[in-house]
Amino acid sequence: MKFDNVIIMTDIDGTLVTDEKKILDKDMKAIERFRSGGGTFTLATGRGYSMAKPIAERIGLDVPAVIFNGSAVYDFSADKFLWHSGLDSYAETVAKELIEAFPDIAIEILCEDKVYVPSINRIERAHLALESVQPILCSVDEIHEESWLKMLIAYPPENIHRIIDFVQSRPEYVSCAHWVRSENHYYEMLPIGVNKGSGFQRLLEIMGRKDAFTVGVGDYNNDIELIRDAKLGVAVASAQQAAKDAADLIVCDNNSGAISEVIEYIEKL
């Protein structure tokens, strides 16, 4: 298949980057070959603007990307949001009640260009250090933003089911948001109807590329809609079973050159 009508949208963590948060040379070379052949390569990530920017710069991203797990479409080359959706105002109450119920919880509120952390733990500290993010440590009441794009919860993986059960047992929580587990230690609150698949569709509309051959690549539960809704859905070998079940194709893991394998597969179609 020629690349000129193909759009690849890939997850970052666990898919594009290795476990050490690096992009393999073989993947970079494949991306460059794909783009030189007319293909469009972009990102769909749970990361916010500041956390996704280093990866966007590393790959020389020249088209918009989906960030905040589908809550926004961002143009890194123009440094501006093209579209975004915010959480229901009830999210503020949810955050306060979670902190009260679980004093050892970490909560991260992601807004357009700021990251607020009203409650922190060791998992969140490690996450912020790894991503070189400077958060604003403050109470929920001190966050004066018009729109929260998403709320991330960090909790030990062996106990995160307690958070999930707490949320799912409260109809008022479930009815006001889309909840998804994005890593074994992360649980996220997103706007209703928002996911990476809906974000991909929004990006295609913005770009005027609704007829493109779409390829979605991912590894975790927050990638399921991206994988399922693409014309070619791809999961890496290290993916969660639910992501694999949604896929048309399984490639090698994120430490072995998954993206280069995807591009080689497309070439042979």
Task: Describe the role of every protein-language-model region.
Residues 2-7, 24, 188-269:
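Mg2+-dependent phosphoryl-transfer enzymes with acidic/Ser/Thr/Gly-rich catalytic loops
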Residues 9-17:
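Generic N-terminal amphipathic, Lys/Arg-enriched alpha-helix
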Residues 12, 47, 218-220:
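Active-site metal-binding loops of divalent metal-dependent hydrolases
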Residues 20-124:
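Active-site phosphate-binding/coordination module
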Residues 27, 52-56, 163, 167, ...:
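Hydrophobic packing residues within well-ordered alpha-helices of enzyme cores
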Residues 38-42, 62-63, 149-150, 212-214, ...:
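Short active-site oxyanion
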Residues 59-61, 69, 77, 175, ...:
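Short, structured coil segments at secondary-structure junctions
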Residues 104-217, 221, 226:
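Conserved acidic, metal-coordinating active-site core of Asp-based
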